[in-house]
């Protein structure tokens, strides 16, 4: 009974604990010193690491022919999951061309043009051409200044340990070589049902199901008592409370956010391997969204510029997405660092077979990146050695690999050429990182020499290009996220002084808080005409002096009131409860349009009619409330039944739409 009682008290204390006071939800979720979930480094550590690596990484991917060109089968594959004609409503012929303002946009800025690939393309040469022209197998189709021996891929063999589907597998065409510099990842206008269908398939059709081997976690392992069970129970309780709180906040902003019980991916109580899978997908999505928001085309002016509202709506309001982006950066940093020793020597890997000078230059730039990734931060930023270690490890790894291959296949369903290019490249990059982390031997004494020797030849050129370019994309995402965050802070700080000055201005002008009772409608009893004439005669000199002073100061005086009357002061309060009482308030006499109007003395008949109208209006109000009572009780009953059902099945309970409260003094 000890664990049960301990868990009960831990749960009780966790639920009673007050929420942390933060400036915003984002500052609580992403603190610089906080450790990224399931990684081994803090947010500030990864940001500092990115500042050190980013210059060398950009130099590698932008100035070398090997890493600036990519080979893929972009046009000769069909979507294997649904019919393109029915499923690609986000394509140029459906969701893009039918936009109302598409015709008003210059043709060069339209989504159809933005999605096209730019620059020269070259077909993959056959083996005979490769033998006849080893130095120029592409025959100059990519340009005379491109080192073709650094671009052409000579190994077309596939590996069953791949985490993505090679583009050349089972295809009639060997693919095209395209320039990544001429086709940057940025806004293309690709949106609509087609894009949503692809992401829905990635998130929902590739989610893990419940374990097929619920008791297999202990297979092959000796039984041992878990260490610190109280700490583990407390950690589980705190994580569950935090997830539930975050889920409720998300569903308040967007009711379409899926529940954790439906997806099975977001849940932290799943095993580490399943959490890593979901974080990779979510982080990739966040990275793509960051690039689209940072390099956004203003289709009115034709300028490429950051879109702050795009960032706020897609990322800033969802700190877990940004956290997953940081996790992906840590994962790829570990893969690049682990790959460094295998690319260090010329005997292990050759980048440019026909150009030793370019080969040496490319190797030096690659090693500059891998050395910074391995040595900038003490210790690994991600520990892959703890994954796939229990009894279910082999089957779970195979399931992990197959589901990531499904994501690779889904990229053929994207209807935009540039989007499909970068989608294929980044899924291949993440697949290569997973292959390096989970299939390659670690650099320890347990790794045999045979394992170490065979590893480099399992990586094809496309895998290396995809890995380092995906790493560069994540690096740019982290840099853009920090700049966007600074822009948000500047915009918030820019609004704060204005409101502060307004508050100070109201205080200096003598404005005070007006109680609610003083805001209610009042009757102002105006003196009789004789008294008014007497007051006017006695104050003539004072009024004349005030008018002269006002004119001298440049202020237009208010017009003189000829006939004062009994009026009702109403501040147009927004209280709806007061509005329904206005109909039976005593109405004062209204003057005629005659300028010589004289107030008549109220008679007994006038008082009786006025009181009768007020009593009749109050009677109608009471009867109406009784008639509405059954419908009100029915609505309250339905609401409470819904709340009970949500509580019973474990869903977030919606707030009440009604309440019991005592009437205030003003209402009485």
Swiss-Prot record:
Subcellular localization, as worded in the UniProt entry: Endoplasmic reticulum membrane
Signal peptide segment: 1-22
Gene Ontology cellular component list: endoplasmic reticulum membrane
Residues binding FAD: 186, 188, 199, 282, 285, 314
Chain segments carrying region Disordered: 116-142, 488-519, 554-597
Keywords tagged on the record: Disulfide bond, Electron transport, Endoplasmic reticulum, FAD, Flavoprotein, Glycoprotein, Membrane, Oxidoreductase, Redox-active center, Signal, Transport
One GO MF term attached to the UniProt entry: protein-disulfide reductase activity
Domain of life: Eukaryota
Start-end of Acidic residues biased regions: 570-581
Transmembrane segments: none
Cysteines joined through disulfide linkages: 79-413, 89-94, 150-352, 416-419
GO biological process, one term: protein folding in endoplasmic reticulum
Chain intervals with Polar residues compositional bias: 494-509
The UniProt record lists the keyword Signal: yes
UniProt topology in membrane: Peripheral membrane protein
Family membership noted in the UniProt record: Belongs to the EROs family.
Subunit structure, interactors included: May function both as a monomer and a homodimer.
PANTHER family per the UniProt record, alphabetical: ERO1-LIKE PROTEIN, ERO1-RELATED
Protein name (database record): Endoplasmic reticulum oxidoreductin-1
Native organism taxonomy: Eukaryota, Fungi, Dikarya, Ascomycota, Pezizomycotina
Gene: ero-1
């Amino acid at each position: 009974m000890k664990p049960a009682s301990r868990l009960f008290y831990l749960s009780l204390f966790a639920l009673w604990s007050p929420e942390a006071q933060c400036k915003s939800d984002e500052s609580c979720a992403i603190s610089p010193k906080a450790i990224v979930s399931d990684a081994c480094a803090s947010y500030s550590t990864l940001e500092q690491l990115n500042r050190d690596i980013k210059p060398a990484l950009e130099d590698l991917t932008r100035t070398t022919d090997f890493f600036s060109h990519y080979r893929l089968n972009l046009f000769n594959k069909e979507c294997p999951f649904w019919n393109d004609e029915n499923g690609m409503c986000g394509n140029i012929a459906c969701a893009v061309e039918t936009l109302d303002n598409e015709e008003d946009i210059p043709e060069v800025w339209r989504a159809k043009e933005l999605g096209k690939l730019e620059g020269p393309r070259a077909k993959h040469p056959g083996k005979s051409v490769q033998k006849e022209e080893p130095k120029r197998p592409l025959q100059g189709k990519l340009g005379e200044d491109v080192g073709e021996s650094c671009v052409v891929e000579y190994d077309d063999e596939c590996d069953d340990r791949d985490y993505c589907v090679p583009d050349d597998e089972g295809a009639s065409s060997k693919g095209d070589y395209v320039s990544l510099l001429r086709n940057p990842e940025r806004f293309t206008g690709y949106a609509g049902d087609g894009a949503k269908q692809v992401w829905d398939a990635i998130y929902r059709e590739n989610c893990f199901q419940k374990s097929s081997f619920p008791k297999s976690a202990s297979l092959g392992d000796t039984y041992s008592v878990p260490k610190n069970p109280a700490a583990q129970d407390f950690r589980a309780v705190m994580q569950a409370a935090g997830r539930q709180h975050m889920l409720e906040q998300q569903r308040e902003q967007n009711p379409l956010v899926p529940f954790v019980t439906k997806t099975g991916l977001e849940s932290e109580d799943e095993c580490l391997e399943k959490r890593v899978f979901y974080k990779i997908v979510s982080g990739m999505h966040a990275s793509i969204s960051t690039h689209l928001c940072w390099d956004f085309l203003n289709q009115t002016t034709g300028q490429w510029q950051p879109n702050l509202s795009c960032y706020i709506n897609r990322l800033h309001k969802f700190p877990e997405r940004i956290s997953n982006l940081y996790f992906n950066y840590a994962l790829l940093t570990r893969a690049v660092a682990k790959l460094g020793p295998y690319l260090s020597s010329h005997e292990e890997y050759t980048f440019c077979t026909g150009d030793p000078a370019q080969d040496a230059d490319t190797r030096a730039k690659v090693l500059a990146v891998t050395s910074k990734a391995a040595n900038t931060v003490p210790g690994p930023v991600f520990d892959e050695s703890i994954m796939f270690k229990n009894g279910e490890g082999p089957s779970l790894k195979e399931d992990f690999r197959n589901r990531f291959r499904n994501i690779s296949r889904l990229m053929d369903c994207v209807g935009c050429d540039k989007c499909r290019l970068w989608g294929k490249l980044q899924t291949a990059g993440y697949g290569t990182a997973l292959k390096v982390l989970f299939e390659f031997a670690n650099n320890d004494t347990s790794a045999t020499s045979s394992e170490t020797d065979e590893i480099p030849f399992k990586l094809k050129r496309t895998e290396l290009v995809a890995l380092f370019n995906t790493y560069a994309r994540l690096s740019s995402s982290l840099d853009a996220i920090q700049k966007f965050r600074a822009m948000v802070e500047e915009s918030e700080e820019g609004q704060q002084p204005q409101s502060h000055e307004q508050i100070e201005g109201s205080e200096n002008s003598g404005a005070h808080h007006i109680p609610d009772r003083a805001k209610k409608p009042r009757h102002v009893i105006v003196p009789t005409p004789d008294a008014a004439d007497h007051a006017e005669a006695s104050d003539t000199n004072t009024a004349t002096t005030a008018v002269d002073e006002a004119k001298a100061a440049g202020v237009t005086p208010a017009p003189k009131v000829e006939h004062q009357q009994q009026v009702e002061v109403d501040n147009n309060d927004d209280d709806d409860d007061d509005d329904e009482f206005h109909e039976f308030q005593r109405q004062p006499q209204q003057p005629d349009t005659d300028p010589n109007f004289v107030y008549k003395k109220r008679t007994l008949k006038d008082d009786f009619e006025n009181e009768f109208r007020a009593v009749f209006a109050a009677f109608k109000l009471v009867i109406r409330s009784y008639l509405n009572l059954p419908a009100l009780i029915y609505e309250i009953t339905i609401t409470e039944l819904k709340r009970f059902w949500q509580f019973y099945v474990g869903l977030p309970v919606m707030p009440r739409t009604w309440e019991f409260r005592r009437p205030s003094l003003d209402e009485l």
